[in-house]
Design a protein with these regions (language model features):
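Generic secondary-structure transition motif, activating predominantly at the C-termini of alpha-helices
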Residues: 13, 37-41, 52, 101, ...
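Negatively charged, low-complexity tracts enriched in Asp/Glu with abundant Ser/Thr
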Residues: 2-47
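Intrinsically disordered, low-complexity segments enriched in small/polar residues
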Residues: 22-24, 50, 82, 113
Length: 123
């Protein structure tokens, strides 16, 4: 499989409630991530690039270029990293784009169409 880059996400078949975050559009999400993750969180000081956003919730898909699991969906809580809970914001990691498409976007799309709330799975 080729290396994931932000451009890798431009032409995937996005399904509601997810949408693509254009290059340069994600800096606000990246700032939010830096403000919310504290020491002990797996994404603390990680290089993270926002590539997708869930429009009906506070979920953002980040590309983590140098990580073994290069994709992470972060559910923002609007809490400060200073609050010190390394379990928040809730984060689900994915091993590949195919993994996120199957377990993330496709599952979220099915819940969205049914009007179901998504299930939070810790990973």
């Amino acid at each position: 499989m080729s290396e994931l880059t932000p451009e890798s996400f431009e032409h995937i078949p996005w399904q509601a409630p997810w949408r693509y975050v254009r290059i340069g559009e994600g800096t606000g999400y990246e700032s939010d991530l830096a403000a919310e993750v504290g020491k002990g969180h797996p994404l603390h000081e990680a290089r993270a690039i926002a590539v997708g956003v869930r429009v009906d919730q506070d979920d953002v898909l980040f590309l983590i270029p140098d990580a073994p699991k290069p994709l992470a969906v972060v559910h923002f809580t609007r809490a400060s990293a200073a609050e010190g809970n390394s379990k928040f914001p809730h984060t689900t990691f994915y091993s590949s784009l195919d993994d996120w498409l199957r377990r993330g976007m496709v599952a979220d799309h099915a819940h969205y169409l049914k009007g179901d709330a998504p299930e939070n799975e810790d990973e």
